[in-house]
Amino acid sequence: MLKVGVVGCGAIASLITKALMSDRLNKAEVLAFYDGNLEKAEKLAMETGADFCRSLDELVSKDLDLIVECASVTAVEDTVIKSLNNGKDVIIMSVGAFADKDLFLKLYKLAEKLERKIYIPSGAVAGIDAVKSGSLGKISDVTLTTTKPVHGLKNALEEQGLNTDEIKEPKTVFEGTVFEAISKFPQNINVSVVLSLASRYPAKVKIIADPCAVVNRHEIFVKGSIGTIKTCVENNPCRDNPKTSALAAYSVIRLIKDLSEPIRIGT
């Protein structure tokens, strides 16, 4: 059985944990939690019967195979370094942290040196397998257009001085590079970094706030020597965290299951 620890105990962590608990094959189990908000970690531990850790050091010192980061971009560096140094592989949900090229290279080299793995799930978009394969050729264009309900972008927009109550129709609130996008929308546009890493090409990003939208819509366009890849996914937002698509959480669950099963489908 794959023994899992979780960093960050919000809605996504709860969804992942409960899905693994309900898996009849029982090939992976969450055994311990840590969150900077200790009350959240203790609450989720009590709900699931897992251990509650008072520090990240305590979590990574436990007998675990895998650490799943569900916290924030600011938690990624510390989580990965301590997990790898304690012999654990890591799944990163807050992949926006890897828009920092220096951090990505630093953690890549550490994982390589220690012969451990850092896993980045496909998240809330479709076609990542095809994009990865296509990146072996020449990529000439990568574009992501994301449309979300206004309330899902509310915090990021208001931090930029926009009054979301004044958005009465679909409004383009951002156009620019993946690096600019993740700095302005760190909890909303992780998929742009996944796409850029998979394609090995910096994505152009457009974000639309739509007051009538009820789903998170991600449209991908990739052009290269292999031809053209176009995908469109309309995701239901996570019920308890509308900034994130439910599919993003399910992609982590699927990855954990793949790591514990003898046959893996897809690139």
Curated annotation (Swiss-Prot):
One of its GO terms (molecular function) is aspartate dehydrogenase activity. The keyword NAD applies. Keywords: NAD, NADP, Oxidoreductase, Pyridine nucleotide biosynthesis. Its EC number is 1.4.1.21. Transmembrane segments: none annotated. It is an enzyme of class 1 (oxidoreductase). This is L-aspartate dehydrogenase. It comes from Methanococcus maripaludis (strain C5 / ATCC BAA-1333). The gene is nadX.
